């Protein structure tokens, strides 16, 4: 499989599929959150700057997370490379942490309930995950392990001609499309949204479990490999922590609702 990672080129300007995924995902989230914000969790004033907060949190968190979790030695040796975002190198777990941190500060500034705001935003986030994984697939990166199944595909970036799991598509479906459906069914057709932080916890647990198991068929990052027992990857460790935090948030959400 070999698709040009550049979606559009105008003179010297190149717009890559990955950048396009970010742009469309953020714009969709901005539109969708306003559409479903029936209880006015966000104020009209806060909507004017929320995109800049989202972008700051995701880019800083994603980049710092990738540096710390996946390639610290390289960036310590060549620190200038930290700023070359166009070369790639983003971490979903880092981007999530960055987004949660900036949203916490944002909510404090505009006097918005943090958990309610996160619950609302996470109803839209899976679409961004879906688009991001499709961009990974187009770029031929984050491909899976060698397989004999009929789902196997050849990725030129792997450096060989073995059939591999299209793990990006597995993630696009289970972490993106399916999670979007689940989150919104719960939001619109159950009383879950009355429990502040409940959707937050469900997102954390769902994503963490799905990512943990898909990592078994995803090729580990070559510079990291396996970090525990010769089968646990960094992505699995971070996803496990994500599940634990999700369970803690779930318990706190239920306790606070009962008080």
Swiss-Prot record:
Protein name: Phosphatidylglycerol--prolipoprotein diacylglyceryl transferase
Organism: Ehrlichia ruminantium (strain Welgevonden)
Any one GO BP annotation for this protein: lipoprotein biosynthetic process
Enzyme class, spelled out: transferase
UniProt keyword Nucleotide-binding, yes or no: no
Membrane topology recorded in Swiss-Prot or TrEMBL: Multi-pass membrane protein
Sequence intervals crossing the membrane: 10-30, 50-70, 86-106, 112-132, 169-189, 197-217, 227-247
Lineage: Bacteria, Pseudomonadati, Pseudomonadota, Alphaproteobacteria, Rickettsiales
GO CC annotations on file: plasma membrane
Pathway assigned in UniProt: Protein modification; lipoprotein biosynthesis (diacylglyceryl transfer)
Localization of this protein: Cell inner membrane
């Amino acid at each position: 499989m070999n698709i040009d990672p550049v979606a559009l080129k105008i003179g010297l300007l190149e717009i890559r599929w990955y950048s396009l995924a970010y742009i469309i995902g953020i714009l969709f989230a901005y539109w969708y959150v306003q559409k479903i914000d029936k209880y006015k969790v966000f104020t009209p004033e806060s909507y004017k700057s929320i995109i800049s907060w989202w972008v700051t949190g995701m880019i800083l968190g994603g980049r710092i997370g990738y540096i710390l979790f996946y390639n610290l030695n390289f960036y310590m040796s060549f620190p200038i490379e930290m700023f070359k975002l166009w070369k790639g190198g983003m971490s979903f777990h880092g981007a999530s942490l960055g987004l949660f941190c900036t949203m916490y500060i944002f909510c404090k500034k505009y006097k918005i309930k943090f958990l309610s705001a996160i619950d609302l935003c996470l109803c839209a986030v899976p679409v961004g995950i879906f688009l991001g994984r499709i961009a990974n697939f187009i770029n031929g990166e984050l491909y899976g392990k060698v397989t004999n199944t009929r789902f196997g595909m050849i990725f030129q970036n792997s450096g060989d001609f073995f059939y591999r799991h299209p793990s990006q598509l597995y993630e696009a479906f289970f972490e993106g499309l399916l999670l979007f459906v689940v989150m919104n069914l719960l939001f619109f057709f159950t009383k879950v949204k009355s429990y502040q932080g409940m959707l937050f916890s469900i997102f954390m647990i769902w994503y963490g479990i799905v990512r943990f198991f898909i990592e078994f068929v995803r090729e580990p990052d070559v510079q990291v490999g396996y970090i525990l027992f010769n089968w646990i990857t960094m992505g699995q460790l971070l996803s496990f922590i994500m599940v634990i935090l999700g369970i803690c948030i779930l318990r706190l959400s239920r306790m606070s609702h009962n008080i």
